[in-house]
Amino acid sequence: MNRIDKRFAALKSQQRRALIPYITAGDPAPQHTVGFMHACVEAGADVLELGVPFSDPMADGPVIQKACERALAKGTRLTDVLDMVATFRATDAETPVVLMGYLNPVERMGYEHFARRAREAGVDGVLMVDMPPEEMAEVAPLFSEHGLQSIFLLAPTTSPSRAATICRHGEGYLYYVSLKGVTGAASLDVDAVERQLAPLREMTDLPLCVGFGIRDGDTAAAVGRVADGVIVGSALVSRIAENAETPEAIPAALKAVLGDMRDALDRSDGR
């Protein structure tokens, strides 16, 4: 069983929600990323999303765009990101790792080469923002052969027929984008999210995890009452940016944000 499936099965049996942090690999410099990954796990992360830096991250807001710029300026490439996962795996064989990014770097490497390298490194899932399930269907068997799950995004603007297609092709978990627009947007209507998730639960048994707008323990707990997991990105990447000149301070900053969210989720009264 894939590490992602194992983790969500364990969480379900414990009636707990997943805490899924996102950080951009190589930000502020490649040598720090593995330490940040371990810090996230120590703070209570259940799954790690590791962003592959790309020069045109169209779905991301300015916070993550700048993180990509910092990582690329330090020479971070897809092959480096895979090396980071391999290094992480040397001391953590349990925490699922999902690579999140855009199609271009994977296409340049070649799907088969990427899938093999990702398997060898210990990657569990892949979420390519700009690759729809119809196109992913062509490479999904290759990914599956190498133990990589294909994870997809859903949004408030996704039509019911489109949502059904995504649910049919999805694996691991579904990433529900709670807000229209780009990452880092401000307002979050949890009641609206609950209404939007309801029909999706009729379509799939996959865990539904919500991202965009998760800023602190309160928003994490509120979303955790209606979703199977919360995904936090910009709130963490902002802390990395604030401490880019003193990277030794970043693990504690990440732990502070995630620790607050973990505590809030665990205190939550359930759904």
Swiss-Prot record:
Pfam families: Trp_syntA (PF00290). One of its GO terms (molecular function) is tryptophan synthase activity. The keyword Metal-binding does not apply. InterPro entries: Aldolase_TIM (IPR013785), RibuloseP-bd_barrel (IPR011060), Trp_synthase_alpha_AS (IPR018204), Trp_synthase_suA (IPR002028). It comes from the Bacteria. The keyword Transport does not apply. Pathway: Amino-acid biosynthesis; L-tryptophan biosynthesis; L-tryptophan from chorismate: step 5/5. SUPFAM superfamilies: Ribulose-phoshate binding barrel. Belongs to the TrpA family. PANTHER family: TRYPTOPHAN SYNTHASE ALPHA CHAIN, CHLOROPLASTIC, TRYPTOPHAN SYNTHASE, ALPHA CHAIN. Tetramer of two alpha and two beta chains. This is Tryptophan synthase alpha chain. It comes from Chromohalobacter salexigens (strain ATCC BAA-138 / DSM 3043 / CIP 106854 / NCIMB 13768 / 1H11). The gene is trpA.
